Amino acid sequence: MTFPNINPIIFSIGPLAISWYSLSYVIGILLGWFYANKIIEKFKPQITKKNLEDFITYAVIGIIVGGRLGFVLLYNPSRYFSNPIDILKTYEGGMSFHGGALGGIIAAYLFCRKYKINFLSFTDIIAPVVPIGLFLGRIANFINGELYGRITNASFGMIFPNSDLMPRHPSQLYEAFFEGLVLFSILAHATFKHKTLKKCGLNSGIFFTFYGLFRITIEIFREPDIQIGFILDSLTMGQILSVPMLLLGSYLICQSNPK
């Protein structure tokens, strides 16, 4: 299959370029805010809509700064240390989910400490929202023709213009499906059907567990970053960074269901 060559820049106004990647962040945050409000309306937890509104600024800063610094420090430090100005070129892509997650967690912790909100109760409301941004971000990765998969002989293998013109797994779409749609469905079912907000930390644990599991599995089909390659001969950076998430998620689930 031939990659549908889509311009990663939607439009430009002078030096300002609006990319699909940037748009995915904006839409993801807006849809996430809307969905989190619906959860608050339904279950009326101690966290209020005003709390959520106040948190948006924290979230945006934490996600963008954390995501960018995570990519710079973990995936391509030599390039950015040689050309620091490139760190600001977020429209080219280059955001780390793990960095963004850590930035978001730190932002949530600081916010909860300031407003005296239970941290895990707050992240339990945020957890069902995150897959929305993950889905849109992976679609943007696909449009950019980046983070493609390994070479495959399968009929659905896709030739990406920035690769070696060999058919490859469209791993961005695999991630959009599992980390986005499937994980969203799991958390929505847990939240609305099984009332998991009643157990502090359970939603957060479900998110971390399934994200870690999905990411570790899909990395088998994803081409490792060329500047890093394989670690210990067979592992990717994404897999290594996802193991702590899987362990943390399992711990939170166990803690939310004490015997």
Swiss-Prot record:
Residues annotated for a 1,2-diacyl-sn-glycero-3-phospho-(1'-sn-glycerol) binding in this entry: 138
Q: In which pathway does it act?
A: Protein modification; lipoprotein biosynthesis (diacylglyceryl transfer)
Q: EC?
A: 2.5.1.145
User: GO molecular function terms here?
Assistant: phosphatidylglycerol-prolipoprotein diacylglyceryl transferase activity
Name listed for the protein in its UniProt record = Phosphatidylglycerol--prolipoprotein diacylglyceryl transferase
Give the location in the cell.
Answer: Cell inner membrane
Residues crossing the lipid bilayer are 9-29, 55-75, 92-112, 117-137, 172-192, 201-221, 228-248
- List the GO cellular component terms: plasma membrane
* Keyword annotations: Cell inner membrane, Cell membrane, Membrane, Transferase, Transmembrane, Transmembrane helix
Top enzyme category? transferase
From which residue to which does the signal peptide run? none
